[in-house]
Every structure is written in C-alpha cells, then in structure tokens.
Amino acid sequence: MCIRDSLNPDPDMTLTEPSMAPEVLSVSTYNAENNSFYAESGRGFGRTGQIRPDLSAPGVNISTIDGCRTGSSMAAAITAGAVAQFFQWSVIEGNNRLAESREIRSYFIRGAVRTQGLNYPNREWGYGRLNLEETFNALLRV
C-alpha cells in the first residue's frame, strides 16, 4: 500500500496524481495539539470528483531525532506507521492474511474520528482524523 502526502502550492486543487490512485491512502495534515487543520496542507477533491484526502493525520510539531518537524511528510510517516501496525496484526499475526490495500484503506476510513458540526468527507479532513484504535474497533463491528 502506498501512502502519499497531499501537498501542492494551489490551495483549491492541491493533490498530486499518485494520491488519486484507488490503492493509495492519501492524507492531509493537522495539528494534534488543538485539532486544527494545518493551512499549508494539501486538500482536495480530485479533478474527476474523487474524494481525497482520505484522512488527516498529525503533522505539526512532531518530535523526531532531529528536533520538531512540521509538514505533510510527518503526517505521511505517522500514517505509514499506523498501516505497518495494521499489517503486523493482519498479516504477520494471521488475523487477515489476504488483506488488500483497498480493504485496509476502507478500515482506516471507518475508524476515522469526525468532528461534530463538519460534513464528511470534505476537502480538508477527508473522512476524518486518523485513529488506529478506532480502526481496530471498526473491525470488531464488521
């Protein structure tokens, strides 16, 4: 599964071509300290109406070995880590050895946390904020 950040300089149509592929989990960036959307983040939808980004992930003031970093690369890295943990549970631990990228994308969308008062999906948050625990909880409800 590919994970692609959604950064581009045009604020109205800021998604690059790889983030439109059906197998890609496309993420925007938000500030987890106050749950605000990061203004520099990419946003969508696609030119043909695809709903992207799929999710928004933390990407502001992220602690790294080199200090605090901010940006869509941080959000993409955090999402990649969440997907890796999901693959560990799914494939390595044998809970769903045949999991495919579209199915996994669907689980993450179902587990997304949504803010009351906002309509989803939307151009900034997609289907909501990445939440791995809620993704696993969504699996229990399937």
Language-model regions, residue ranges each:
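Short polybasic/polar patches that bind polyanions
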Residues: 123
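Hydrolase catalytic cores
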Residues: 59-120, 129, 137
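Mixed-charge, polar/low-complexity N-terminal
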Residues: 5-7, 27, 36, 103-105, ...
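Secreted peptidase-domain scaffold signal
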Residues: 133-142
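Extracellular S/T/G-rich loop segment that most often corresponds to the catalytic His/Ser-adjacent loop
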Residues: 7-88
